[in-house]
Design a protein with these regions (language model features):
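Glycine-aromatic micro-motifs
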Residues: 1-126
């Protein structure tokens, strides 16, 4: 199965060690969401994505992230890590590759709006 990661699980971030240790491959693909979403930075410093847009924030954007191939064990581990269903919930979205192929993948959406410093959405967590 494939999971779209957009935050601290990405390469070069603190929690990437989880994917590095347990993913099926040591490589990933850079992809972008087909639909637009609102991604914001919480006051805790990590990003969250809203499934449904909120008029409290700027316009939704196509999000950039990494696509990782994982197994059943890792998806259950990520569910616990992402505190599903309290903090996040897992759902599916479509992402597009650079060659324009579209794929259905998992993503973690915020279960509720978190506190933010501003209302400006971001395209990519850097």
């Amino acid at each position: 199965m494939l999971v779209f990661v957009y935050g601290t699980l990405k390469k070069n971030f603190d929690n990437h060690k989880i994917l590095k240790k347990y993913s099926l491959h040591d490589t990933f693909l850079e992809v972008e969401t087909v639909d637009k979403f609102q991604m914001l930075i919480s006051t805790w410093g990590f990003p969250f994505v809203l499934k449904e847009p909120s008029n409290k924030f700027s316009e939704p954007l196509h999000l950039k992230g990494e696509l990782w191939e994982i197994d059943d064990y890792l998806i259950e581990y990520l569910d616990a890590f992402e505190d599903v269903p309290k903090l996040y919930f897992r759902d599916t979205i479509n992402v597009v590759f650079k060659n324009k192929i579209i794929k259905d993948v998992y993503i973690y959406f915020a279960s509720e709006i978190m506190n933010t410093y501003d209302n400006k959405c971001i395209k990519e967590f850097l």
